[in-house]
Amino acid sequence: MKHGFIKVAAATPRVTVADCKANGEEILKAIHEMEKEHVKLMVFPEFCITGYTCHDLFLQRCLLDSAWDELLHIADETKETDALIFVGLPLRHRGKLYNVAAALNHGRIVGFVPKTHIPNYNEFYEQRQFAGAEEEDVEFVDFLKGVKNEEDEFWDEIPFGTDLIFECEEFPEFTVAAELCEDLWVPAPPSIRHAINGAHIIVNLSASDEMVGKDSYRRTLVSGQSARLICGYIYASAGEGESTQDLVFGGQNMIAENGSMLAESRRFENGIIYSEIDVQRLADERRRMSTYPAVSTCSHTRVGFSVEEEETELTRTYPQYPFVPSVKEERDERCEEILNIQAMGLKKRMEHIHSKSAVVGLSGGLDSTLALLVMVRAFDRMGMPREQIHCVTMPCFGTTDRTYQNACKLSCCLGAKLTEVNIKEAVNIHFRDIGHDDSVHDVTYE
């Protein structure tokens, strides 16, 4: 957690449809595995306690009771787990049934986030069982009445609502909000509100089925949302074990940060992916972007959670040359773009001043070579002859035969005029004028 890095994970455990006890054991197994990696934010799929494909079994009291009991069991078993954990289950509230993400921390249920957008098109018919959440004030509800006694730490009322931001007490920039599956696919996802109200990480508990080509679209959604909101985005989806009666789930898990995909699972394999999200960098980037809205302190409810601060061992990698793509095709495309941008700028300037020629100092090194290539492209776009480009090479003490020959060949191949002005004697005269010994290669010499 130090220096802004938060160790995070997205997990897809094997699920047994409608067997909450078995699913709870798989969830706990995954939690203990993530504990070994010192993960501070753990995200599981939508309906991971029951399975997504329970269909009308969701309307059965026995399944709902079993899911609730298993949530309490998972909470009780994770009292010593130093992390914020998100799991999915069905939850009864005010006579309706909701698809919720439950947030757990040190054995406590710290919040319920209901799904806002309930799909009822194509292969989805969730409205048959579930109600969509309203964007309204967060309620504090005594869900545990009659389940725990008054001396038990569970006795606190639990916040229920879409507009919850979970804020780490030890590290205020570690702020998390949740949305569920379809919420990301709509024109205005809840994560927009969450981000502009201070959430640096969005978690998505999902059960997204597989269709040909859907994985790339899903990836674009996740990376694009993380870029647009300048946030970390953790996407955990259902996988093997769900019913394949009419759908197949591939368990495509992703962790993205500000448009970059930090980690992605192999589809059709259950498991866990890990990475580190730099929330301090995200906060800095938001401050730099003058059009990013100021954080509102009144529209969302802040819910505190606690994790210990410790060193984070980095598994994510940073490129040695961040501005130079390692893939040749991408590198060629980037170089082409650089040339076009600079050539367009030069073309506009030359047309504005009605210039018919240009002069460039050509040493044979990288900088002057790029300048000449840009100039050639600008002249070609203006339909002007390259002979009007005047290259001047000025060999001196530091000029090697290689760079000198490069300058000569480059101008010749590109059809530009070349003039050589040897400046050795002029520099020696200047050294004598200022009283500097030309054998002393210090700052003055350079």
Descriptions of predicted regions:
Residues S368:
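Catalytic nucleophile loop
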Residues Q342, G365, P395:
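Conserved hydrophobic/aromatic pocket- or pore-lining residues that grip, position, or stack substrates
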Residues M384, M394-E446:
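ATP-dependent adenylate-handling ligase core
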Residues M1-G361, L372-L373, R377-Q388, R402, ...:
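Enzyme catalytic cores with a strong preference for nitrogen-chemistry domains
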